Structure formats: C-alpha cells, structure tokens
Amino acid sequence: MDFLELEAIEGLRWSWNSWPTTKSDCESLVVPLSIMYTPLMHFSELPTIPYDPLICSRCGAVLNPYARVDYQSRIWSCPFCFHKNLFPRSYSGITETNLPAELFPTYSAVEYSPLPSRQSGSNTTTPTAAASWSNGFNQGVRSMPSNSSFSSLASSTVGGGGGVISELGPAFVFVVDASMVEDELRAVRSDVLFVIEQLPENCLVALITFDSMVRVYDLGFSECSKVVVFHGERDLSPDQIQQFLGLGYSKQFHHGKMSAIRKQSFLLPLVECEFNLTSAFEEIIPLVDVKPGHRPHRSTGAAISTALGLLEGCSVTTGSRIMVFTSGPATRGPGIIVDSDLSNSIRTHRDIITGHVSYYDKSCGFYKKLAKRLCDSSVVLDVFACSLDQVGAAELRYAVEMSGGFLLLGETFESEQFKKCLRHIFIRDADGNLSMYFDVSLEVVTTKDMRICGALGPVVSLRQKNDIVSETEIGEGGTYMWKTSTVTNKTCVSFFFHVSNEQNRKPQPGSAFFIQFITRYRYGNGAMRKRVTTVARRWVAGKSPEISSSFDQETAASVMARLAINRAEECHARDVITWLDNGLIRFASRFGDYIQEDPSSFRLTPNFSLYPQFMFYLRRSQFLDVFNNSPDETGFFRLMLNREGVVNSIIMIQPTLLRYSFDGPPVPVLLDIRSVTPDVILLFDSYFYVVIHHGSKIAQWRKLEYHKDPSHETFRNLLEAPEIDAAQLVTDRIPMPRIVRCDQHGSQARFLLAKLNPSVTQKTDHTGGSDIVLTDDMSLQDFLEDLQSLAVKG
C-alpha cells in the first residue's frame, strides 16, 4: 500500500513510516519525525457513532481497535498506558463476533455524534434513553445542556446531523469598508446580500461599516437607520466597546421578582432583522470626498476589534465569523499600515528587513493580541481584500491564520474569484446545514516512548502539559492540545515528535507504537462532534533498511517547507536557505551510496532521489525568495502553505508542467526552460496561478484563426484541451487561482519563465529551439553536482 492509499484510510502522511528506537538515531535522520494530519478529511467510508466515546480513565485515550478486550470480564486494556478499564453496562452484548464500530480493525477513524435527549430542568449528561446500535447493541443516549446565551432562543432540538442542535445558528458579522469606490461597493453589496438570502433564518447577523469612523448598525430599530459610532483612532478594550454598545444585562422586576434580561439589537437572528439588514446595506454610501494626494481614511483594525467586542459581549457559543471586505490599507487607528498621505509609500520587504517601517511591528502586535481573543472566543476572521495596492495582509495574516479564516487577495470585487470564494464558505450539506466547523480542538495521545514537540499550522497551543509533552518546542509547542476557531475538510496540521529514552529504556525493534488524534468540533447545525483517529507503526533498529523504505519524500518536503517559513518569520531568508542547504548535505551524506571523496560515485535510491529536487525548488520559491513579491503576497503564500495537505504543498513547492502537442495526449515534462518550444502548448500549475503558454508557432496559427477553419479541427482541439484541464484544476481551490494566458516571448510569459529551471542561460552554450533565461541563478544540474561534492567529503 503506497502513501496516498494510506492517507485515504487514515487522513495522515508521515515523513518516516518506521521510527528508530533511540533519540540519537532519530536525530541522524535530519528530517524530523512528523505527521501531516488532516483532522476533518473526507473519507469514502467513515462510521458515525451515535453515542459518546469510552475514555481511558488514566491517559484519556479513546477506545480503539488496538485495545485488548477481555470479553468474559468486560474489560478493555488501553494500548497507550496499559490501564484496564471496565465496559459500562450498555456494552453487555459485546463478543468477539459482535463488536461496536470503534473496535472494528478496518476503521482507523470514527466519528462520534451523540443523539441527545432533552431533560427539562437538568444540566447534567446522564443516560435517559436507549438507541439501537446497527450491530445489535443498546447504548445510553445522553443529554447535553443548551449553551445559547440568548435566553429567548435558548432551547435545543435534535437534528439529522446528530448531537444537540441549538435553535440559534452561527453568527456572522459583516464588516464593510465604506471607503470603496461605488462600483466595488455595489459588487460587495450584491454578493453579500445574495449569501444572506441563502442563510438559515436562525443565523445571527450584524453589520459594521468603517472609514474614518466605525459604525455598528442597530438592526432591531425599524423607525430609521440607527448606528453607534466609534472614533476610528481609538483602541478600545472589549469592556469599553461593550459598554458603549450597551451590552450586558438590565435588571427588571416581574411579578415582584427581579430578572436579568439580555438587551441588545446589534446581533439578531436573521428572521428578525432581514429587512433592516438589507436596508442598511442599501444605505451604505461610498466615500467621495477624499483629499487630493491622500488615501481614503480607513480604520480597519478598530472595526475588526469592535466586531469582536460585539461577539464577546453577546457570548455567542454557536460559532461565529467576522467577514471583512476592504479595498485598501488601514490609514488610521490600531493596525494602521500607512499614512493617508500618498507621499508616504506602503512598506516593502526591504523596509521591513532594514527596520524602516513606522507601523509594521506595532500593527503586527495589535493583530497578534486580536488573534488570541479570536481563538479564546472561537471567532473566525475572514478578510476579502480587493485592491491594486497592498491592504495590510502581512500584518493581518496571523489573526486570519490562527483563527482558521480565509484570506483573499484580489484585484476587484467584481471578479469571479471573489464570488466563488464567498459562496463556497456558505455551502450546505445534504440536510441543508451550513458545512462549517467551529470551536475546533485537537488532542494527541501517544505511547510512553515518544514526546510531542509541537505543531505547525493554523492552530494555537493551549499550553496543556502532561508526561508526553517535550521540553523542546517546535512551532506551537508545550502542549498536547491545540485550538482553532474553524477548519475545512482540507486543513492540514503538521505535528512533530521525538523519541524519549528515559532511564536508558528503549522499545524493542519490531514492536508497535500508537498515536491517537482526537478532534472535537461544533458542526454548522450547532451539534458537537468528536472524530478519533488511531494508528500504529513499528519501531525499527537504527540501521534497519526499513527506515529507508518508509521515507515519504513528498511529506518530508512539505514538513521542511513549513519549518523553513516558520524560521523565515524570525530570520533573514539567506539564513533559512543556508539552514536548508546544510540539512540537505547531511541528509545526502547519511542516505547516499558513494565512495568517499568521489562525487561521480554518488547515488540516491528512488525513494530519496526526488527530495534534493524538492529542496532546490523550495529555496527559489516565493516562500523564501521574496524579491518579486510584496509583503502582502508573501504573507498570503505562507498562510496557504501552512494549511494545505501534502499534495497541494508539493505543487506549491515544485509546480507541475504538462505539454500539449500534435504528437498525442498531454504528457508531464520537466520544469525546465528546455520544455519551452514553439510548437507546443504548456499548462503550468503553481497552485496560486495556472499558466496556459502557447509556443510561438501555436500563437501565430491562433492569431491567423486557423482554429475557426473546420478543416483544422485537430488544431482547435489542441487549443481547447489545456483550457478544459485548467478549468478543472482551479475548480476545487479556494481562493480560486488566476488563469494566465500568454504567448512565447510575450510579457505575461514571465509567470512561467520565473519558475523554470534555468538550464539554458546567457552563460551556457545554446542550441536547439528552446528559450534561454537571463539569470545568474544556479541550475538544478549545478545544484545537484555541488550537493554530491559536499556529501561525499569525509
């Protein structure tokens, strides 16, 4: 079974699928012991279990197929800590031939979605009824208390998705930049109102607009438009925001008794305020009196902080999103990016490196504090930024990433890219529920011989320690539990481990070790669910050939890319590239076959041979080589790499290239300048954009409109084939990549040429029909020759 087939079963990719038994042997691997985990990956077969999981009373692991079961005594032994646990009475029918789904050996992952029963006046979780199991068991059904903070709609029901479903849906706060030009504002209004019309009526909604001021709309006031206005310059605390909005409890006497009633009309169920919300959107007037030579006043940071303060004050626990629509940088208040005076240019990478930035560090600090509040309250921050200029995504990135939100950098809100991204967020499942996952927590349980170092991805450490947490931290470390506000079916987190040999004890080669991932989340219908993935691998001796055969070079490259961009946040890019190079030399020296001091003898086996190539393209990728990108673009690229799985990460690191010609069907070709020839069409996929490149002869024939001649049907089919394939490539990606169409020697061809291996340059002998690249960059062949020379040194 190959690594992709294993991922389809487990939702995991391992850099090494067999682990050495000692810490020193693990360190000699160079590539760390790591697992890329997609918590809510879509499986073709995922058993849904309608009751709560059984938990080991000692280590907290969930009952799984690796547990040893004594059917006579109804006892199960935890494979992680070996503690013996009693089965409850509801498992009385368990036998070797009558197993619950969580013990089926074929299920690496199961999902618990308890069917609750309501018990009036009770806030405890107790068995109250019996649900029939598909395999003949009866399991107690448990009730869960309603958690709505809105007393008028606090009751709960049972829905088809399982779990307790609050009558209140998720909350959405729409934060709109009122400094947009009229056409852009019209496009935002049209698309946002479209998705609002599709929302379930129990969803909570609010509207905030901002320019130099921040306006919070009172959606419960119908006589006229009523807003609470905040000055955009002020950085208010959550308590101050809530005080000015009048959030909290008012005391009233009813039949001689004092009662507390929540009074607010800024965040209301859609069914109560849809007309007022639509009217408020229609009344937003674009700013027209911008001073010549100045940027519009935008208080973006104050608006986001106000939206979060509103959600915090309303104690929303059903999941919530702050959705920001902006067309320029913040020019005042907390989170400011640049002064409004156009004589002050927006910061570049060089400005950040040299420290010539007025606001960058302070604004990053503001958004990092905001990120903690977002995660503490399980609020998602989505930013849709459409502008020809930078908008401050580099500063905003941390808050968006740590909350799991979407970041879109586009040119105009009238684009199909924006429409598709916005509507994708609000898609529904077969039962009509929003396909959203809120309030997500991740927990890792391991056997005693390993330690958890940390995680890299859109998660925040909860700083919960136990015996399996390492003192060495990588990324978000110092914990066995992490949190984020939301994930998607594609969100992927990289976890790092090391082997612990305390008191000189080490596991026996050939024995198994276990890792369990427990993901808790709230579905779009309000139901709480828990997905449990339990997997096993084997310990091997340090020099065992199983180590080499277990190496997954695609996962290793993805992991090293995340480590590299994590380092790049603190170090200069040149230092990060040096770190990558030194690691690659040690890796090649460790796993290459060679005669010492003889570079020509160097060989790598097939399961290692692609790894140096991945590192070559990573060093010259947009993640580390930021020369041609703005800080906003770099922040976006790194955010996407830090959340995508192995397959998409590899496309980002080493893009794919397909050749279309009259000789036959499309074929993959080398990512090399020699692949550019006049008589072919190339389809280039870098994940962030897709290029359809016509060779000079193809472009000439197209301009002569040969494809419109019925006698040249083959040529027409040749032109259509890459267009169809490009459309399929971008279909499932959010945000949708840009499709660039260009001709050989045209200006847009730079999107392709910049990513190709410069095997033919102005310094090399040039023969044949391929292009040349004007560059001083090292080619892949020179890179590999240097690697071989350094790897074979004593």
Curated annotation (Swiss-Prot):
Entry-linked Gene3D superfamilies: beta-sandwich domain of Sec23/24 (2.60.40.1670), Sec23/Sec24 helical domain (1.20.120.730), Severin (3.40.20.10), von Willebrand factor, type A domain (3.40.50.410), Zn-finger domain of Sec23/24 (2.30.30.380)
CDD domains reported in the protein's UniProt record: Sec23_C (cd11287)
Membrane topology: Peripheral membrane protein
Region spans: Zinc finger-like: 56-81
Subcellular location, principal: membrane
InterPro entries: ADF-H/Gelsolin-like_dom_sf, Gelsolin-like_dom, Gelsolin-like_dom_sf, Sec23, Sec23/24_helical_dom, Sec23/24_helical_dom_sf, Sec23/24_trunk_dom, Sec23_24_beta_S
Localization (cell): Cytoplasmic vesicle, COPII-coated vesicle membrane; Endoplasmic reticulum membrane; Membrane
Keyword annotations: Cytoplasmic vesicle, Endoplasmic reticulum, ER-Golgi transport, Membrane, Metal-binding, Protein transport, Transport, Zinc
Described function: Component of the coat protein complex II (COPII) which promotes the formation of transport vesicles from the endoplasmic reticulum (ER). The coat has two main functions, the physical deformation of the endoplasmic reticulum membrane into vesicles and the selection of cargo molecules.
Protein name (record): Protein transport protein SEC23 G
Gene giving rise to this polypeptide: SEC23G
